[in-house]
Structure formats: C-alpha cells, structure tokens
C-alpha cells in the first residue's frame, strides 16, 4: 500500500458546525458570536428554541449574519485539499505538447487521447491557452458538439468531453464572437446538443454547458438565439431549484443574467415563471450569498418591463426582496434597492408600495441610509422615502425622534 493511501484529511475544528459537526457550507453567526451552518441553526430555531446551542445563552434576537470571512477560508481550504488530491493522482503526469498534437488527431476515436487532453488542460493556464490558440482544434470541438443526430450513450460521452474541454479553455479564446458564430450558425444543431446534455448530463456537465453558453452570449442576436433554443431556457429554469447543487444553480443564473437584456428574452423568462423560482430561492435559508446576489440581479433586470413588474408585485416577491436589503452583501443590497426603486418609485406600483409598508420595510430603508452605502444607492433610498412619506406619512412618524437627522426632506 502506498503511504498516501493512508492520508486522512484533518478538518480544522472551527470549520465544523457545532450542531452537525460537518464542514459548514454557509456559515452564519448569531448575536452570541458563535458561528453555525445556516441549515442547522435555522432548523434549531424553527424547532422553537431560543438559546444559542453552544453557549445556551438566551438569544435577544434570532437574526444571524453571514460569516463571509470564514466562508472564504473554508472555500480556500477545500480548494487546496482538491488540488492536493489531484496532484497525488497517478494520472497527474502532464502530456507534452507534441503528445497533445498527436492526441488531437485521435480525439474522435480514442478515449485515451481525450483523457490526455483533459489532463493537459487542467494543468495550467498556459496549457489552456495553447489549446485555445489552435483554431482547428476549437473548430473540431464545435463540430463534435453539433453532431446531435444520433445521441447514443457513447456519443453523449464524446460530446460531453468536447463541451468539458471547451468550457475549460473558453476564457483563453481571444475571439469570443468567432466562437459564438461557430456554435450558433450551424442550423441549431449545437443548441440541440446543449439541450440534451443539460437534460441528461451529470451536474458538472450541465455547469459546463451553461458556462459555454454564457461565454458565447456576446450581443443581442446571440442572446436571442440562445433564448429561442428549443426547450433550452425551460430546462435551465427547471434546474433553478433548492434541490439542485448550489454551483449548478449559480451557473444557470449567470447564464440567464447574460441573456436577459432584450425585452423578448425577458418575456420568455417571465412566461417560464422565473420570478416564482427566484422568490423560492430567496426564501430558502440555505441559499448561498452568491446565488442570492444573482437572483436579485435577475429580478432587477426583469423589473424593467411591465410584465416583470406584474409578476414581482404579485405574491411574496416584494416582501422577500425587502428581507434581503440587509445582512447579505453589498451587491445584494444594491440589487434589492434597485428592484424596490423600480417598482415603488419609478413605476409607482401600488401593490409593491403596500407590501413594503406592510412588513415594515421603511425601517430598513432608513437604517440603510445611515450605513456606508454608495451614492447611487443613497439616491434611490431617498427617492423611496419620498414615495412612502407621500403615500403613508404615518408609517414614518414613529422614527422622527431618532432618525430626523437623516430624513431627505
């Protein structure tokens, strides 16, 4: 037995949730200063407990704050563990460029050739740049992806590996527009392949598909072509669910953000009930900070059209956005404020205004004005307060003693 077979990963104790004893995926801190995994502490509080599990102190409030510093440390540690595992793999010997040139010639017919190219691409930025600079190789990958006429299991594997390599080298491809044209001007065959891979592939392959599609969404025309791909958007939105892997959700949200620029695309997303999906994610306590930011950014884009605002103002979406105004991240705050500014101030949607007042959203707006927010956000918050002063002056009266100094009017 090799010595590295006996290697056991030691998890730092402060990376473990005191409740589950597992590595925390979304660390949050209570008012006592103790950090827990969001899922575990939310379950503890939902069960009616009002104490900190570790210290047994009675909680003055049940709010928790994302521990972003610890989250980054855990991510860094996890990445280092994965890199060490890869470096200890018996397959870690990197092929030479001459071997790669020979492997490219045999790519279609030999599994070993494809594995060799994948190992080469994983090794370094220089290797990925080398592959991306070979126009004939990139064109061959696109040609393989477009062959969706006979999608057998073996063909699915071949096309999937082509997508995986293309995803790995995409950021080293200098001419994005040329790649976009290669993929999108072949009668739709490539988009059909992407649809089948997203429908039938494993989560990692689905992420690679979304990453490539996001990369080639370079202008209004390409974004519309992707959005109109048969069944593609429908399948992507299906995967935006709390049941899905967080990385997969994030990749799909990034793709939707990339294509949601024109009104036609926004209407297509609205018809697929995207707002309902986003609201569901935002109300889920296990949703990560980055996914929350992307959900709010999509709502911001959708709020620019009438149909989008109608969806946002129905149900609990507005209340959910108000709840994300604080204690998530600066980006989340900016997107949430913009959504509220759009529906409440710019387009004066009565339902949205009523919802903000109903859940005491004006308090959070006032508190945000006292925070270190950007000048743009401050202007939008001031506009919002003007709306609520006109529409419901009584809702501000209780704050006049402590917050008069920040009132913008």
Curated annotation (Swiss-Prot):
The signal sequence is none
What is the protein's name according to its record? Answer: U-box domain-containing protein 28
The record ties this protein, via InterPro entries, to:
ARM-like, ARM-type_fold, PUB22/23/24-like, RING-Ubox_PUB, Ubox_domain, Znf_RING/FYVE/PHD
What are the UniProt keywords, alphabetically? Answer: Repeat, Transferase, Ubl conjugation pathway
Q: Which pathway is this protein assigned to? A: Protein modification; protein ubiquitination
What organism is listed for this UniProt entry? Answer: Arabidopsis thaliana (Mouse-ear cress)
The record's ARM repeats, renumbered to this chain, cover: 178-218, 219-261, 263-304
What SMART domains does the record tag this protein with?
Ubox
Q: Which SUPFAM superfamilies match?
A: ARM repeat, RING/U-box
* Enzyme Commission number(s) of this protein: 2.3.2.27
What is the catalytic activity of this protein?
S-ubiquitinyl-[E2 ubiquitin-conjugating enzyme]-L-cysteine + [acceptor protein]-L-lysine = [E2 ubiquitin-conjugating enzyme]-L-cysteine + N(6)-ubiquitinyl-[acceptor protein]-L-lysine
Query: An example of a Gene Ontology BP annotation on this entry?
Result: protein ubiquitination
């Amino acid at each position: 037995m090799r010595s590295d077979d006996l290697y056991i990963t030691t998890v730092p104790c402060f990376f473990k949730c005191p409740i589950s004893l597992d590595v925390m995926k979304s660390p949050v801190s209570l008012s006592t200063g103790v950090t827990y995994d969001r899922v575990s502490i939310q379950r503890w509080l939902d069960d009616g407990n009002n104490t900190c599990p570790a210290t047994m102190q009675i909680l003055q409030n049940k709010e928790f704050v994302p521990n972003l510093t610890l989250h980054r440390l855990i991510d860094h540690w996890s990445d280092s563990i994965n890199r060490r595992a890869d470096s200890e793999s018996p397959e870690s010997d990197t092929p030479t460029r001459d071997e790669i040139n020979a492997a490219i010639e045999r790519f279609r017919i030999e599994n070993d050739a494809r594995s060799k190219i994948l190992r080469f691409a994983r090794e370094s930025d220089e290797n990925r740049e080398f592959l991306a600079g070979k126009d004939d190789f990139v064109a061959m990958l696109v040609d393989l992806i477009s062959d969706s006429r006979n999608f057998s299991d073996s063909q699915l594997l071949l096309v999937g590996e082509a997508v995986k390599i293309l995803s790995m080298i995409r950021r080293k491809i200098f001419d994005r527009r040329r790649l976009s044209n290669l993929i999108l001007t072949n009668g739709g065959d490539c988009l059909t392949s992407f649809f089948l891979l997203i429908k039938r592939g494993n989560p990692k392959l689905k992420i690679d598909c979304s990453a490539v599609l996001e990369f080639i969404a370079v202008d209004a025309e390409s974004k519309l072509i992707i959005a109109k791909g048969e069944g593609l958007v429908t399948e992507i939105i299906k995967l935006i669910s709390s049941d899905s892997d967080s990385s997969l959700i994030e990749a799909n949200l990034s793709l939707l953000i990339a294509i949601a620029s024109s009104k036609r695309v926004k209407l297509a997303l609205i018809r697929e009930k995207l707002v309902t999906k986003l609201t569901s994610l935002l109300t889920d306590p296990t949703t990560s900070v980055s996914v929350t930011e992307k959900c709010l950014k999509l709502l911001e884009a959708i709020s620019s059209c009438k149909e989008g605002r109608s969806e946002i103002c129905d149900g609990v979406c507005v209340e959910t956005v108000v709840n994300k105004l604080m204690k998530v991240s600066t980006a989340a705050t900016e997107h949430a404020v913009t959504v509220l500014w759009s529906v409440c101030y710019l387009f004066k949607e009565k339902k949205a205004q009523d919802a903000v007042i109903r859940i005491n959203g004006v308090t959070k707006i006032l508190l945000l004005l006292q925070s270190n927010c950007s000048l743009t956000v401050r202007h939008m918050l001031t506009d919002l307060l003007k709306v609520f002063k006109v529409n419901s002056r009584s809702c501000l009266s209780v704050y006049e003693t402590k917050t008069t100094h920040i009132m913008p009017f």
